[in-house]
Amino acid sequence: MLLEMCVFCSGFMSFKMINKIKLTALCFSLSLGVLTVSAQESAIKFSSKTNSDKSVELSYEKQDPGTYTVLLRFRELTNTDASSEQDITIKGYSGNLLTLKPQNTGQGIGYSYASTYIRGKFEPKYDANFIYTLPYKSGVKAMVSESGFVGARYFGNTTPDDWKVYRFYTKVEDTVTAVRKGIVVDIKDLHENNVSDGVAYTSKSNDMIIEHADGTLATYRGFKKGSFVVEVGQTVFPGTALGLNSKNNSNSGFNISLMLTYLKSKEIDRSRTIQNSKSLYGFITPHFATAENADVILESRKEYNASIPAEVFKKELTKKEMKKHGVK
């Protein structure tokens, strides 16, 4: 997830690896510190144009089609009745952000602003009982473990009340699949999968974010480097192959983690530290369809067999998409 302010950004969370028990429970943390980056690294670029009627158009271009919440704070704003604070939802690769219209058409508009943005639609309406599939092909058996919150263990801040992240283990390397229809909005494929003993935690993982139609986000972490078979901007469906899971240390099985979130706050505080940070995202406890049960909340350290029933496809797919996937 990404949070940026003008030409500076804050990572949403960093993946941590805890090697404590045989079936390793891998943990996540939320990192909300602001980091300075160059304009070339910015996920969204803003531009402005003054029209012949003295109106000003603010536009955006970005690197993925996903939804962002943009916060504009005008330091200077003259000859227009626009609000000095604007919260705007954007999606797609480019578009109009805001148009400022002059009060006096014979004069130009004076303005300067700071922009902050974070991935996701603010407070989306979602179904808490939505049924997801396991992140593997039908018939694959997976051991489930709940991941702890590494911040509470290592950095002193408290675990979010709604914290829920699952890790799915397989005995052999296997294909990771989408748990729901959505659009791929981010892929990080940077790190070799080095199997090491005695590692307390690491932020080095290969990740993917998929945005769903209701504004929720699925973050998959722990892919084998170079194994991704989908691209940013691609629509995926339940069971669509995404890449391969990986092994984190010699004591763990091959695995992938899954976290379902939504943007619940836009109260961004640059003074936050690891110790006092609070998540801007809410966490969803998902319901899953498995071979054993059509609607179940998973229990840690239990095995489940993956299944993709037709009802899962019928929930979101169009008639054309269902026909393509052989769903009647």
Predicted segments, located by residue:
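Short histidine-centered loop motifs in beta-beta connectors
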Residues: 216-239
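Structural beta-strand segments of beta-rich domains
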Residues: 54-58
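Acidic, glycine-rich catalytic/binding loops that coordinate metals and/or anionic ligands
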Residues: 132, 234, 254-328
